[in-house]
Amino acid sequence: NLIQFKSIIECANRGSRRWLDYADYGCYCGWGGSGTPVDELDRCCKVHDECYGEAVKQGCFPKLTVYSWKCTENVPICDSRSKCKDFVCACDAAAAKCFAKAPYNKDNYNIDTKTRCQ
């Protein structure tokens, strides 16, 4: 679920960036999403959105699904025993790892999505 996603992000990025820094970044990080991602980090969010979309197609509710996971040496590890829980956790873990690797450009935070996300 979204609260766990916050924790997974903090696990993967070793506390180097607050999860809120990703909440309104580029065209896809945060609610909704459209257009062309502005950079690598925004592409991570687009892929995460698409992963959640696939979870919904499989009958899951990704924003509400509570799953089991642990943080081992800054690596989120999923540990659920059901299809939906594992799928959603994998979406979140992959996104968090992607966030940790991607450069953060503060100029892409809180952008004007109406003009930049066509």
Swiss-Prot record:
Disulfide cysteine pairs (residue numbers): 11-71, 27-117, 29-45, 44-98, 51-91, 60-84, 78-89
Enzyme Commission (EC) number: 3.1.1.4
Mind listing the UniProt keywords for this protein, alphabetically?
Answer: Calcium, Disulfide bond, Hydrolase, Lipid degradation, Lipid metabolism, Metal-binding, Secreted
Known SUPFAM superfamilies for this protein? Phospholipase A2, PLA2
Q: In which tissues is it expressed?
A: Expressed by the venom gland.
Per its UniProt entry, which superkingdom is the organism in?
Eukaryota
Q: Where in the cell is it found?
A: Secreted
Pfam assignment, any one = Phospholip_A2_1
Q: Give a short account of what the protein does.
A: PLA2 catalyzes the calcium-dependent hydrolysis of the 2-acyl groups in 3-sn-phosphoglycerides.
* Name of the protein this chain belongs to: Basic phospholipase A2 PA-9C
